[in-house]
A protein has these predicted regions:
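TPR/TPR-like (Sel1-like) alpha-helical repeat modules
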Residues: 51, 99, 107-134, 159-167
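Terminal, low-structured helical/coil segments at or just beyond the last alpha-helical repeat
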Residues: 132-212
Length: 212
């Protein structure tokens, strides 16, 4: 009887865990849609709810991001720099290679007055994102990698910004604006690459079906 009860309890725990993860994913998708159209308050609410449901939730395949990166980035976009810093540091404590989180941590620090550490984090985030895009487009060039940053627009922008950081006179307003553009552009690229891959597969499938 004890063994049976234990099995039932375990099954219930697994079921509830799966439900929480599914609900978290639904909130993340809604949050991303809100975030990408600039509805930052709504995005923050969705991401925060997802973190409450499943604090270990990770989104994505090619560019994996934990939920605290999303909470922190949306908090930054609402101007809540204290919440942003806490969440972004938590994201990086879970995975130090969360380069979008690092980029936004740098932005948060810079806009909170700590430009010295801020520029280091921005630079580190940019370098990490560049390396990730290079890896995705090279290692997976025969699969989903061929749909990422196809014109090299993101990587070229990163190279220009890194050169600006290394220059003598750093234009902070431009760096912050460019970094915010980069953060959103990379997030958009997730959807664009997925869309292009899906359309390509549909064309291939349609072509095969039409063959005699």
């Amino acid at each position: 009887m004890k063994a049976l009860n234990s099995m039932v309890f375990f099954a219930v725990v697994v079921f509830l865990s799966g439900c929480a993860s599914f609900q978290a994913g639904t909130n993340v998708e809604a949050g991303r849609k809100a975030f990408l159209i600039g509805n930052n308050e709504a995005a923050f609410g969705y991401f925060q709810r997802a973190a409450e449901l499943d604090p270990t939730y990770v989104y994505g395949v090619a560019l994996r991001q934990n939920i605290w990166s999303y909470v922190g980035r949306s908090a930054y976009s609402t101007g809540n720099f204290s919440q942003a810093r806490n969440s972004l540091e938590k994201s990086l404590s879970i995975n130090k290679e969360e380069d979008l989180a690092r980029l936004y941590l740098g932005l948060t620090l810079a806009r909170s007055g700590d430009r010295q550490q801020g520029v280091k984090e921005i630079q580190g985030g940019m370098k990490g994102l560049y390396d990730q895009l290079e890896y995705i487009t090279q290692a997976y060039r025969y699969s989903y990698g061929q749909y990422w940053d196809t014109r090299g627009e993101i990587r070229s922008a990163i190279q220009r910004d890194l050169a600006m950081i290394d220059g003598k006179d750093l234009d902070w307003q431009k760096l912050i604006s460019n970094s915010e553009w980069l953060g959103r552009k990379v997030e958009e690229e997730i959807d664009l690459a997925r869309r292009d891959e899906r359309e390509d597969r549909l064309r291939d499938s349609s072509g095969r079906d039409s063959q005699p």
